[in-house]
Amino acid sequence: MLNSIHRSFHLTSRHQIVLRLCSPSASRTIMSSSPHSPIPKTHTASLDSLNDYEEQFPPLTGGSKTKKFYLGSTNPSTPCQSSQLQNWTSGKDALSLQRNLGCKNRRRRRASRFLHEESNGTTFEVGAGIGSPTSMVHFDSTNPSSSSKSSQSQNLKIRKVRNHRNSGFKSRDQSPQRIKDPPPFDICSSVLERNDTSIKDWILADETNRETVEVSNKHKVIRPGMVLLKDFLTPDIQVDIVKTCRELGVKPTGFYQPGYSVGSKLHLQMMCLGRNWDPQTKYRKNTDIDSKAPEIPVTFNVLVEKAIREAHALIDRESGTEDAERILPVMSPDICIVNFYSETGRLGLHQDRDESEESIARGLPIVSFSIGDSAEFLYGEKRDVEEAQGVILESGDVLIFGGESRMIFHGVKSIIPNSAPMSLLNESKLRTGRLNLTFRHF
């Protein structure tokens, strides 16, 4: 209708305002006056209503010059004599004006408002947004009894700049920004080159001495089917495991923070090998990004098999029998869940019961590797922290529980800060925290 609209409001003695519309393409003045008064009557409205009106009529692109015309009274006792006013207030614009004067949306009134002084009053220049033209609202004293001094005292000079961070909505010319995915979690503070020579040399030595299993005096059977192998993973092997997990973890199928549909998150970072797992869907072959879960490195499987053999040797030695495989069945893992706990990480008491019924019925064990900071590990027959027993798992320890102990409740109460070996941190650049690998068979 109009290329650009500038609106002016005159402040009266009752703090009401007079509506002006300014058009660069029209120089007509539309006014209506009562036959009983020499002063033109004007359309009046409360300040709040006109603020609502202002926010619903965004400025339009127009010419550089501004000319004004006035809207006269819409009072039924003094009907407007101008067809232009009737035309302007008819149809869509009149309905919009009537509807929007009662607008309840107050947030949009808080849009950026730029004020500057004029010689005859104070002008509010309302910005519609960055890069948008502005409309003008004049507050002039029109009370004949008011003096010029009182009029000048009403002049204000306020300048507000829109703050996008605090505004409850985006400007008209600002398109919604796409929320970017968080970068992959890196368990290391810097990138190091891979070096698998330690694990490979250890595997060759293990193949040569497979029949001879030396049992450390530090190893112990905690309960039937539950064995702790202290310092089973040598420092060099720990470094190689960290590097391997880091290489897999920074990929799209790597570490993530699992959570529930209600929004709560586990206090750890997780990566799944062999099969994907999360608290909602349990096990599945594909990951959340619709791709196959990474395979378990062969070197990891070799370490698990050797740990189980050493646990069998320990059970046979302490029991005086050769019935270890019945107490702790042999297991070839096809799932590895890698968890990284920060210094504040923890995991509540739970049972590992998402594997197949056959796997659980046979008591196929869970094998857990600990690397980095030590952890206070809890276990018990019930989900009761007060009754649970505890053991400290240090870097290099391997914990195995199967058979009768397969369905025990277990969890991580706390991480002991600054307890990781300095040689491990220096060589692997592992972040402060605990890296835990748990192997199982589905």
Curated annotation (Swiss-Prot):
It comes from the Eukaryota. Keywords: Cytoplasm, Dioxygenase, DNA damage, DNA repair, Iron, Metal-binding, Nucleus, Oxidoreductase. Its cofactor is Fe(2+). It is found in: Nucleus; Cytoplasm. Residues 135-144 have a biased composition (Polar residues). 2-oxoglutarate binds at residues 339-341, 434-440. Residues 145-154 have a biased composition (Low complexity). Dioxygenase that catalyzes DNA N(6)-methyladenine (6 mA) demethylation to modulate gene expression and regulate seed germination. Residues 170-183 have a biased composition (Basic and acidic residues). One of its GO terms (molecular function) is DNA N6-methyladenine demethylase activity. PROSITE patterns: FE2OG_OXY. The keyword DNA-binding does not apply. Residues 332-442 form the Fe2OG dioxygenase domain. Residues 135-185 are annotated as: Disordered. GO terms for biological process: DNA repair; regulation of seed germination. One of its GO terms (cellular component) is cytoplasm. Fe cation binds at residues 350, 352, 410. This is DNA N(6)-methyladenine demethylase ALKBH1D.
